[in-house]
Amino acid sequence: MRLTASEIAAQFGLTVVGDGATEVSGVATLAHAGTGQLSFLANPRYRPQLAETQASVVILRADDAESAQGTALVAKDPYTAFAKIAALFDVAPVRAPGIHASAVIDPTATVSPTAHVGPFVSIGAGSRVGDGCVIGAGSIIGEDCVVDDGCELIARVTLVTRVRLGKRVRVHPGAVLGADGFGLAMDAGHWIKVPQLGGVVIGDDCEIGANTCIDRGALEDTVLEEDVRVDNLVQIAHNCRIGAHSAIAGCTGIAGSAKIGRYCLLGGHVGVVGHLEICDKVVITGKSVVRNSIHEPGEYSSGTPLTDNRTWRKNAARFKQLDALARRILAVGKENQ
């Protein structure tokens, strides 16, 4: 595919600075782009690369346009504009409708004639696969699941039981949705398993990363509202609810019955304690541990920032002395009263 800068600008509401007839046929970073490729400048730290890039077209903000060496496309948000334009060059393979001969489908399951069911797929009793879905190789859809129109299970995805995917949900390889939640009760020194009778409900336009696990609820469903984006290797425990348009980065763990609001961002390796609530528009930075509910929007952090080993050891030793030091300060204060 080849597009001119003017064609791209017209399609996405951008302003051309330079030669609108400049053609691009692909995308790349500023540092590695060459002739015929489009790049973008969103982070100021990469501004020095603008003078050296070989990209034919660069998406940038208006105040950077004069520094562009070639044709520029001016956007209010260059990164978002780049994401939309790059999608034009991301040509997905065409999946022809039909069911592979090796797939095993229960007689009570229903599969749309426009769906693609790949090799070694299993679809259980009472489940339904909607129009235009792609069920990739080795995926397992258990009993009583719904995969609504336009969904894609890329490969080796497991929907255990009572999982409902909304429209246009994308699930990456190795993800497991609808496994038992971690519900246990102690009785006479032995664990008793608490039956997990709920399900998992995923809203429209969600994306679930590779090897992520979302457990089904004990009594009520585990719910991801619409347009939630979950990275790889995330654990979402039973009965959690994730608000619409939130994003969760890799290796994050969310304990049972936690409620996270709309438009929240959780960085990598965040831990969220169970049975708490996080309000809308909260940002939790990477490696933080959320131990209490959050009722005010904003950015929150915890954890120990990286420093050199010698300084860290000194600080750790002093941290152990904080209680004794606090007691001494209190004692001095009382003596001076």
Curated annotation (Swiss-Prot):
EC class name: transferase
GO molecular function, one term: N-acyltransferase activity
One Pfam match: LpxD
GO annotation, cellular component aspect: membrane
Alphabetical list of InterPro entries matching this protein: Hexapep, LpxD, Trimer_LpxA-like_sf, UDP_GlcNAc_AcTrfase_non-rep
EC number: 2.3.1.191
Catalytic activity, reaction form: a UDP-3-O-[(3R)-3-hydroxyacyl]-alpha-D-glucosamine + a (3R)-hydroxyacyl-[ACP] = a UDP-2-N,3-O-bis[(3R)-3-hydroxyacyl]-alpha-D-glucosamine + holo-[ACP] + H(+)
Listed GO biological process terms: lipid A biosynthetic process
CDD domains: LbH_LpxD (cd03352)
UniProt pathway: Bacterial outer membrane biogenesis; LPS lipid A biosynthesis
Active site: 238
Keyword annotations: Acyltransferase, Lipid A biosynthesis, Lipid biosynthesis, Lipid metabolism, Repeat, Transferase
Function according to Swiss-Prot or TrEMBL: Catalyzes the N-acylation of UDP-3-O-acylglucosamine using 3-hydroxyacyl-ACP as the acyl donor. Is involved in the biosynthesis of lipid A, a phosphorylated glycolipid that anchors the lipopolysaccharide to the outer membrane of the cell.
Similarity comment: family membership: Belongs to the transferase hexapeptide repeat family. LpxD subfamily.
Alphabetized NCBIfam families for the sequence: lipid_A_lpxD (TIGR01853), PRK00892.1 (NF002060)
Subunit organization: Homotrimer.
Protein name in the entry: UDP-3-O-acylglucosamine N-acyltransferase
Species whose genome carries this gene: Xanthomonas campestris pv. campestris (strain ATCC 33913 / DSM 3586 / NCPPB 528 / LMG 568 / P 25)
Gene this protein is translated from: lpxD
